[in-house]
Amino acid sequence: MDLKLKDCEFWYSLHGQVPGLLDWDMRNELFLPCTTDQCSLAEQILAKYRVGVMKPPEMPQKRRPSPDGDGPPCEPNLWMWVDPNILCPLGSQEAPKPSGKEDLTNISPFPQPPQKDEGSNCSEDKVVESLPSSSSEQSPLQKQGIHSPSDFELTEEEAEEPDDNSLQSPEMKCYQSQKLWQINNQEKSWQRPPLNCSHLIALALRNNPHCGLSVQEIYNFTRQHFPFFWTAPDGWKSTIHYNLCFLDSFEKVPDSLKDEDNARPRSCLWKLTKEGHRRFWEETRVLAFAQRERIQECMSQPELLTSLFDL
């Protein structure tokens, strides 16, 4: 959504303040764009409890000077108004308004080795400061963007070593695969595919077994075949969850697999309905045929387009 405001200066002046919204039901607001059905029941209850115990700040808030001179004069909280262009500028790895001598425009996510030893520490600090920071969840590439290329020299060798499931955690496996993916794709800028979220969901469900997929598995499928979503803002996840809940092309089915510890359903899965299969054949495949070249440019493996879309 692109809002065009007449009095922009007034709204910009509210950055870092709590002028209103104290009567806002933040508990319900936070869970509207969130997906928790892929989590265990205990984790869902704990997340709702943590939000439920939060209370809005008392007014008026006590102003205090920021220690670093860059933060707001009040204690940060969920009810604070902020300018997202200042907190997390999109499409740029630089600060929105750098000072005169500290222009970070040409600094890349991977720092180059300095010519002099004296400026090594200063160079690293500038690179870290140039990365956008946010309280929301960052993508894997953003989290690992401050590493130097030398950190990834042995990644391919590590990936080829046999995995011991008893010694290696799932988080470690995921981390290694993401590092390897980053090496192969760090120099390429991916474009957004000409497909909406309902097409992406149908594509993921159509190319997986009939038992269905969880929400997290749909996310993983989308990022695996369309790398644009590795670095895209997390809003696309909320759109996928919205489409799953409100379109008649998808239905939720209970997972038949049981957890061995407490014998409960692991999570809910999603499947294509008859209407979903019809739309895949009449809409998604037709769009893929018409936009074949553009879609292939956005895919990590363009040769799979024919099999994925059943062309």
From Swiss-Prot:
The gene is FOXR2. InterPro entries: Fork_head_dom, FOX_transcription_regulators, WH-like_DNA-bd_sf, WH_DNA-bd_sf. This is Forkhead box protein R2. PROSITE patterns: FORK_HEAD_3 (PS50039). Residues 115-128 have a biased composition (Basic and acidic residues). PANTHER family: FORKHEAD BOX PROTEIN R1 (PTHR46789), FORKHEAD BOX PROTEIN R2 (PTHR46789:SF2). It comes from the Eukaryota. It is found in: Nucleus. CDD domains: FH_FOXR (cd20036). It comes from Homo sapiens (Human). The keyword Phosphoprotein does not apply. Expressed in breast cancer cell lines and primary cancer. Residues 192-294 bind DNA. Keywords: DNA-binding, Nucleus, Transcription, Transcription regulation. Residues 129-143 have a biased composition (Low complexity).
